[in-house]
């Protein structure tokens, strides 16, 4: 069974405490320059985890990813190109 996952971006003052985020989910990426970490966890637990993480003194802010709510199914490019060509021809005539 596959669980729905969602990313949480955790902005931190210091990166020393990145290891402590592992208990909340999978730490996918850490940016040393911008001082943030991307944490993946179950979608059902996102709000609870973001509240818990935001209470730590080393956390500046917590943002949730909107990727699960975006449309990822696209029309084929060929159909779109064909429609655009027909529109151009009709306009030019």
From Swiss-Prot:
Keywords assigned: Cytoplasm
Subcellular localization: Cytoplasm
Entry keyword Cytoplasm: yes
One Pfam assignment: DUF2129
Segments forming a coiled coil: none
GO cellular component: cytoplasm
Record family assignment: Belongs to the UPF0298 family.
NCBIfam families: PRK02886.1 (NF002777)
Record-given protein name: UPF0298 protein lmo2054
């Amino acid at each position: 069974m596959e669980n729905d996952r969602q990313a949480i971006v955790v902005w931190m003052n210091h990166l020393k405490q990145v290891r402590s985020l592992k208990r909340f989910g999978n730490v996918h990426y850490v940016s040393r320059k911008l001082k943030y970490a991307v944490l993946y966890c179950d979608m059902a637990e996102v709000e609870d985890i973001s509240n818990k993480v935001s209470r730590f003194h080393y956390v500046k802010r917590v943002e949730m990813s909107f990727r699960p709510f975006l449309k990822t199914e696209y029309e084929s490019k060929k159909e779109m190109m064909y429609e655009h060509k027909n529109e151009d021809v009709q306009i030019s005539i």
